[in-house]
Amino acid sequence: MLSDHTLRLLERIDKAKKLIDAHRPLSKSILSRLREQMVLEWTYNSNAIEGNTLTINETRLALQDGITVRNKPLKDYLEAINHKNAIEFVEKLSSVHSKISERNIREIHSLVLKEIDSDYAGTYRDINVRIAGSKHVPPDALVVKKKMEAFARKTLNSKEHPVVEAALAHFELVSIHPFVDGNGRTARLLMNLVLIKRGFFPAVILKNDRLKYYDVLEKSHSGKIDDFIFFVGRSLERTINLYFEAIPKIKSTFITLKEASKLSNYTVDYLNVLARRGSIPAFKLKRNWLVSKKAFLKYVQDNQ
């Protein structure tokens, strides 16, 4: 059972997606720029969460120019290149009209660890493991394959809302922890494969949100999955906002709550409450709520 604030977030995401879809096809230059930005941010943040020491600019040099940075481990450079290749594989899988399979997950993992740990790349663990800082104990190595088969069959390709399916896919994969290393990066790639395959955008979990990310994941192990679904949804909403910023026709149809207040008898504080409740069609751009001017004026008229 999802909480009201998660349901409102999902509704907001659906409305935002419909708005972007209504402005398709987007120009090739906008799509190219957005993709380049997403690949960089996704790669940098996902690797940084796992301890990679490359800065975002060093990651950009590695991805775009193949330049290694002095005094940084070769492993960090390989992780950046591997992650970019894994994203390209995920994009390819998302365009194929077949279900996401257990084999696909192993293929993604194989790309993540390529030339870093060839013995375990794409191979399920044959030892028992613990997750650092977590009370959760992953299943015995002997049952990993069976667990993964059941996971692919029951959780992936479900009829849940795409954000819910993506969050559950991520959570269940890290719960099984099927690999010796690379579980987190593989889980985030799988999460976004689910989203992209179902017509959404990748959700980038930021390095700066690492502690919150681990906290909501840990709570999920005790049955409180709603917080993690909300966390994934907010990460996706951040990507949607990047699309809004990049599409002038969309951006020009929205006004700030301060501007909306001048068109009505509502205060900015009250409009902020309405926006958070989902009562008015608003979205958050960075720290500011924006509302559709046309839809807001209709709301005012309907509630006079």
What are the residue ranges of the model-derived segments?
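FIC/Doc superfamily catalytic core
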Residues: 1-181, 185-304
